[in-house]
Every structure is written in C-alpha cells, then in structure tokens.
C-alpha cells in the first residue's frame, strides 16, 4: 500500500481496512449446479454455452480444446485462439471442490469467488448457518480472471490447497495473458487472491485482541480472532500474475492478501508478478513465508500492517523503474492503528531473513528501498538492500518516533544506495542501523543478474550475491526465530549454483516468459 510519506501516522478510520468493495448482490445470487453444496457461476463470460459436463473420455491432441468441462464447472467457451476450453469455478464453493489438471483445459473465476462463508472468530463455535469450503487445485492448473472485480476469497474457517511443483507450478493470471496479449509492463488485469483467517490482528483498541474482527481491504470479508495457529491451507509453487486493482483511493486488491492468517498455513515458493498495487500485503496474523519472489509491483513489494507477527525467509523483490505509484518500497512495514497509544498498541513484529531488495532504477522519485513506520517492531537479518537510482531518497527510512521507540533491529544487513538513509529521518534510521552487528551502510554492490536471456528488461534483476555480499558474516537465523533456517550467507541467493528461484517462476530465466 502506498503510505503518505509525509505523514507519520495513520488514523483508525484511515488505515485502509474499512473501505469495502461493493460487490453486487447479483454476483452472489447463484443458481444451483449439481448439488446444494456447489452453486453455478452462471452463463458463459466468453460466449460459450452450457453448464458442466463430465470429463472427456480421451485426452485431446496438443492444441485441441477439451470437449467439455468437469462436473461442477461451467463451460464458458474457448480462449487462447480456440485452443483451450474455459471452465468456470462456482462463485460460491461450499464443501470440497477439486480443480483437476486436464489437457486442453484452463479454468476461470468471475466476480468474487468465495470459498466457504465467514465462520466467525471461534473455530469451536462457527457462526450459525455458515459453511466451510475446501478448494484443492492440482499441480499445473492455470486459472484466469478477466477484470478487476474478479478475485478469489478464502473465508475464515475455509481452506485453499494450491500445491504445485517446481516443474508444474499453479498459475493464477489474466484473460489477456491466456490470450497472449500481455507485455512486460502489463498489470492490474484482475483482482488477486485473498486469504482471511482467525489469527490476532490490531484492528481494535486492545493490547491483545481476542475477538477482534476487521474487514479485508478491497473486499467485504471479515478476518481476525485469537487462533495464532489457524490454518487457511497450503500454497506451494504458485505464480500470481498481472493482478491488483484499485477500488478507490487507498483501497486496493493486491496480488496476494493475507489477513489474520495463522501459522498453521503454509506459504512457500510464491511469485507475484506485475501487481498494480502491492505484491503481497499481510494484515495481522502469524503466518510464515518462505521462498518468495515479487517482481514488477507498482507499489510496495511486501507490505505489512495491523499486527503481523510472523516471519519470512528467502525473498527476492525487484521493483519496476516507474509507475503510477512513484513512492513505493521493497518493504513497507506499519503498525496501524496509531490512534492507540504505543504502549497499548498491538504492534507488528515482522521478522525477515535472507531477503534481497532491488529498488527502482528510476531517474525521479525512486524513494526508499525499505520503509518502517507507526511503531513497527521489525527484525531484519542477513539481508541486502540496493538500488542504482540517483533519485533514491535513501536505502532505508525509520519514519517516526514511535518506530524509533519500538526499535527496528538490523543484523548482518548490507546496503548499497546513493544514500543509506532518507535525510528527513536519518538520525533515527542511523541509530537503529548502527546499533546492530555486521551491518554495512555504504557498501558497493557486487550483485549480478541471471544468465542472459531473461524476458524482463524493465527492471534490474541483480539479485545474485557477489564477493562483497558474501563477505558479510551472517547471524544465526534460527536463534532469532525458530521458523528460520541457518545459512552461511546473507541475501536471498548465495551464488549461481543457488537455484531455489528457478524452474517455477516466470521472467527470470531464459525461456520462462510471463
């Protein structure tokens, strides 16, 4: 989310969780399909006909669309120049639904596609009349959407199991991308994915929120509770491309939004490519992340708010050089609401290890690579912040006295920018950075890019460590946070032989176009 970089606080009514997306009632009024557990998404969006049928008895030849759709999915016609059958998911998913990998088939969502209905804050006492949904997506499946109001929402008490593999990632993308009509600057062509859980968050004036409920930005969905280990499912080897949509000023859908998501949820090997807002935004909760790639976000790479107390290890952020949101950052970490005194505020406590942030290579207003405000109590270890832009206001900024009081901890962090700190906050920022161990404020980057042939030319892809980065002694990550793994290096990628980011991503290696 793009913060007001001249203001130092966010008000209770303005910290971006109360403005709701007005979803039409007609989008939620669904005809029956098959059984009462699965509702029909309606007639075809692309001129196709008919409802769901049974899978074809034989596999169609390559380039030939499947004859029909699986039971429970609506046949909405052909896409990709007539080579793929488009099968639309129900807009309301109650009970269990599996999206199977089938030859000649791509899947679609239209409008708000909800998994379950909100079951409330207490897993032991779900809201009367609420329903659980469990959506399972098989490895290699592609799902597209056609507009900004199309998004996938997993409600409290429901789960999403989207588990791809390195060779067969699951891809969420836009209709334009399926039709071959996107470029490396395309963005904002559909909404995104929203997970809403029952873990604590700060949208109440309580030190320890127990039954605190908030509304997820860009939706009318509720999140929050007191279940730190809440489980919203598993996401592994997933691409989310060309997403993000501004509903109104300060109220947007991101590539991936996680609100009140608990530590029982698995988020591992996720790429968000060209989101028109943030790549990933986390509101509260205790979810942990590992192996994250965020490239080309128009706003922030990773944005956290309202009391997130989890960790993330092994992450790459590469920012696009220019866009409508000029004041973006690789990290923007906040702790709204600031209407609560700091001593009573349920502040965010993000813990980050082995990240490489590559800021905008912009000639004007590139701003900062990492930004901390509103009392965020962050810990950053074994990481690299860099940007080549001479317009950069600074590698890092601690924006206000509350954040200086809470304390941002830096250990084994290597920064290489024209200025290490934003001048307006340099005293606070320098005090925090120099208090840590093994930190380098004015380093010379020796980061390198992947081998020639990458498909993204509109951003710097220099995220592989060189001699200067590898000369920094790392701290023991597992001592800082039990979720972390100890490493012998800082940054996301140690050297050319460190290939965790290859094979399942797009745009970063030759032949893997987005």
Each model region followed by its residue ranges:
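Catalytic metal-binding/acid-base residues of hydrolase active sites
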Residues: 142
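Glycine-rich loop(s) and the adjacent beta-strand/alpha-helix scaffold that form part
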Residues: 168-169
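Sec-dependent N-terminal signal peptides
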Residues: 15-25
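Bacterial Sec-dependent N-terminal signal peptides
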Residues: 2-8, 23-78
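Extracellular beta-rich repeat passengers
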Residues: 42-48, 60-132, 146-157, 164, ...
């Amino acid at each position: 989310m793009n913060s007001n970089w001249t203001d130092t606080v966010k008000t209770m009514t303005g910290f971006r969780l109360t403005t709701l997306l007005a979803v039409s009632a007609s989008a939620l009024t669904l005809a029956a399909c098959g059984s009462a557990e699965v509702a029909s998404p309606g007639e075809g969006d692309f001129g196709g006909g008919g409802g769901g049928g049974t899978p074809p008895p034989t596999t169609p030849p390559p380039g030939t669309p499947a004859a029909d759709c699986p039971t429970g999915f609506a046949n909405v016609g052909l896409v990709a120049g007539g080579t793929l059958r488009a099968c639309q998911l129900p807009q309301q998913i109650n009970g269990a639904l599996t999206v199977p990998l089938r030859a000649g088939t791509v899947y679609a969502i239209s409008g708000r596609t909800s998994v379950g209905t909100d079951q409330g804050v207490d897993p032991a006492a779900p809201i009367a009349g609420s329903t659980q949904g469990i959506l399972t997506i098989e490895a290699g499946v592609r799902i597209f959407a056609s507009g900004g109001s199309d998004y996938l929402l997993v409600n409290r008490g429901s789960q999403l199991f989207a588990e791809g593999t390195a060779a067969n990632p699951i891809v969420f993308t836009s209709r334009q991308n399926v039709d071959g009509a996107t470029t490396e600057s395309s963005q904002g062509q559909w909404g995104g994915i929203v997970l809403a859980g029952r873990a604590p968050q700060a949208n109440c004036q309580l030190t320890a929120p127990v039954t605190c409920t908030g509304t997820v930005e860009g939706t009318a969905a509720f999140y929050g509770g007191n279940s730190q280990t809440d489980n919203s499912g598993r996401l592994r080897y997933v691409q989310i491309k060309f997403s993000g949509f501004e509903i109104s000023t300060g109220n947007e859908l991101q590539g991936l939004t996680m609100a009140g998501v608990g530590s029982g949820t698995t988020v591992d090997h996720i790429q968000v490519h060209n989101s028109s807002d943030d790549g990933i935004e986390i509101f509260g909760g205790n979810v942990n992340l590992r192996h994250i790639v965020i490239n080309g976000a128009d706003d922030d790479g990773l944005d956290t708010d309202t009391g997130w107390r989890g960790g993330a290890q092994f992450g790459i952020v590469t920012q696009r050089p220019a866009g409508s949101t000029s004041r973006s950052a690789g990290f923007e970490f906040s702790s709204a609401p600031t209407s609560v005194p700091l001593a009573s505020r349920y502040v965010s406590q993000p813990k980050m290890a082995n990240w490489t942030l590559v800021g905008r290579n912009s000639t004007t207003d590139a701003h900062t690579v990492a930004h901390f405000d509103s009392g965020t109590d962050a810990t950053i270890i074994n990481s690299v912040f860099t940007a080549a832009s001479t317009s950069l206001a600074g590698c890092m900024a601690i924006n206000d006295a509350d954040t200086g009081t809470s304390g941002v901890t830096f250990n084994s962090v290597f920064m290489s920018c024209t200025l290490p700190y934003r001048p307006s906050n340099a005293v606070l920022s320098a005090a925090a950075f120099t208090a840590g161990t093994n930190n380098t404020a004015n380093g010379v980057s020796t980061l390198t890019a992947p081998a020639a042939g990458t498909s993204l030319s509109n951003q710097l892809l220099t995220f592989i460590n060189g001699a200067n980065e590898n000369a920094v002694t790392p701290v023991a990550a597992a001592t800082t946070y039990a979720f972390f793994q100890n490493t012998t290096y800082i940054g996301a990628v140690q050297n050319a032989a460190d290939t965790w980011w290859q094979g399942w991503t797009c745009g970063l290696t030759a032949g893997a176009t987005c």
